[in-house]
């Protein structure tokens, strides 16, 4: 990212109204103020942020090794500085990983055939396009809304992986100060809504592959359908289940399933997940009370499936346990704290409720199970 050349020095007069200034230093392009805050941290940021932002600076509060209060002003970032090689490298790696996983797992191309003619792997391009299309649309929704609100956000980082989808998803980094609850809400909600729009396009795509029955026997993984997928499939008359349990749906549908599942996980109302940002914008500090319930609920769900329903750890039990642990850790960090805490209007609040409702339609108790054919 390229730094904006500030039009002037940081507005020291504004800072001194809430900060007893001892010393000012310039370090690595930043202006660092040492002293003693006269008000609580959040109040200081709220008081000085508008003037600093107008002058072209982000402002942060910290403390020194000598227990002095420190205010750091750094030039605001905007645009892209040079070629984003890390983003490009991860994207290309994920294209390759989803292509390989798609070819061997969902198109049933033998390894020997791929070795003999590597171009046969290109048959899995529809799967790769579906998966990456959903993920990138989701993250670009965050990115574009962040740029709209003038918040420093990174380009998406797509994470390659192995079976069963070839990716762990995608993330962006929010590096700038969050100006208000409206910006926090808009950035948080843009990703899930954009991703679900892409998921709808994927599941209704005319580029389908006829279902085929698997010839081999033994154990196979079954991806059960969330309600939203069944609703979309009903509209286009495309079956997602078959009388023969060995029949495999179109890999395009698998891309839609993945988009819905990632949306569900992202809408968990904890920490830096989209749901955490959205609920923080909607409820303010009350979001923390809801966040405490999430890990407990996920562990309870895993226990219910294992001890009452008899599902194994390698089915959805392990999945919910993992997300219970992950949500426990990320809940401690919490979502971004906006400078301006003015509540949202009714329109945004209703959009938030609608977004969580769509997320609920992506939920099912047992997303993954193992069956013996």
Annotate each PLM feature.
Residues 1-373:
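Hydrophobic transmembrane alpha-helices and their immediate loop junctions
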